[in-house]
Amino acid sequence: MRYRFGVAVAMLGLAAPAYADAWDFILINNSGKEITLIELSPSGANQWQKNKVDEGEKPKNFKVGGRNTVHFDKAASQCKWEIKATFADTTSTVFPAVNLCDASFVTIRFNGTTPVSTAS
């Protein structure tokens, strides 16, 4: 009887979904443009999620040179993310392959027209 119970418990563990963890980082906006929306997607997945804000709060714009906290749900094994910034002029740019597992701060900027991100 104990054996069957143990097997049943083990099987439930296998059927459990992979839960996402709530993560955050500080985004430093050195893009030269005000940002109105930040979205994140696992690299190459094209599954965008908006920066999460607390219930009852309005999303805040990311001023040029400013620092804002970005909140998102991260799967346990996913480290490389794409960050999409939508600017006040309604254009958007994707900053690719940012390692968010090892970063507390991410700076985004442009080198000419090429999007560049630095994580630390």
Question: What are the residue ranges of the model-derived segments?
Answer:
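Bacterial N-terminal signal peptides that target proteins for export
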Residues: 1-7
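Cleavable N-terminal signal peptides
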Residues: 7-8, 18
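Sec/Tat signal peptide C-region and signal peptidase I cleavage site
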Residues: 14-20
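Asparagine-centered strand-capping/turn motif at beta-strand->loop junctions
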Residues: 26-32
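A short, solvent-exposed beta-strand micro-motif common in secreted/extracellular proteins
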Residues: 78-88
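Extracellular beta-sheet/turn segments enriched in Thr/Pro/Gly and aliphatic residues
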Residues: 92-120
